[in-house]
């Protein structure tokens, strides 16, 4: 994960989760990846939570990124729906907590089995 994030570092990255902010930060800190994400939004960061696009749109605004320049990468149908509703390309991952079939059913634009595969999508 560190190697892939290091390659992506020149891009503006965010974490948008429905989890509360404090435990999200503990997870990111524990994985030693906080430095890669200048924007981290927890479930309480916006009035609406995913699958509503509001948290994704807020992250894009904070990063000053347009929808055409952005992609959401997620392991749940909520991620894919929120990204699509915000006008982003969507990438589902099959290595998360959600069963592959559920991620596929959300019909992401891309589907990857490893984080490293993401590099070929954003090259």
Question: What annotation goes with each model-predicted range?
Answer:
Residues 1-15, 21-25, 53:
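Short, acidic loop-to-helix structural element flanking the phosphoryl-transfer center
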Residues 2-9, 60, 80-85:
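Surface-exposed amphipathic alpha-helices with a cationic face
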Residues 33-48:
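A short, structured active-site edge motif that brings together acidic residues
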Residues 34-38, 66, 112:
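Conserved H-loop
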Residues 50-80:
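Conserved Lys-Pro-Asp/Glu-containing loop-to-beta segment of HAD-superfamily phosphomonoesterases
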Residues 71-110:
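Acidic, Mg2+-coordinating phosphoryl-transfer loop and its flanking beta/alpha structural elements
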């Amino acid at each position: 994960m560190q190697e892939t994030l290091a390659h992506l570092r020149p891009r503006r990255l965010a974490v948008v989760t429905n989890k509360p902010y404090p435990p999200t930060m503990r997870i990111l800190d524990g994985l030693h990846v906080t430095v890669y994400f200048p924007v981290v939004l927890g479930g309480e960061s916006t009035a609406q939570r995913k699958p509503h696009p509001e948290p994704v749109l807020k992250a894009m605004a904070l990063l000053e990124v347009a929808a055409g320049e952005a992609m959401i990468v997620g392991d749940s149908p909520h991620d894919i729906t929120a990204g699509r509703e915000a006008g982003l390309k969507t990438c589902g991952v099959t290595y998360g907590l959600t069963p592959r079939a559920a991620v596929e059913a959300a019909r992401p634009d891309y589907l990857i089995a490893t984080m490293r595969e993401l590099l070929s999508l954003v090259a």
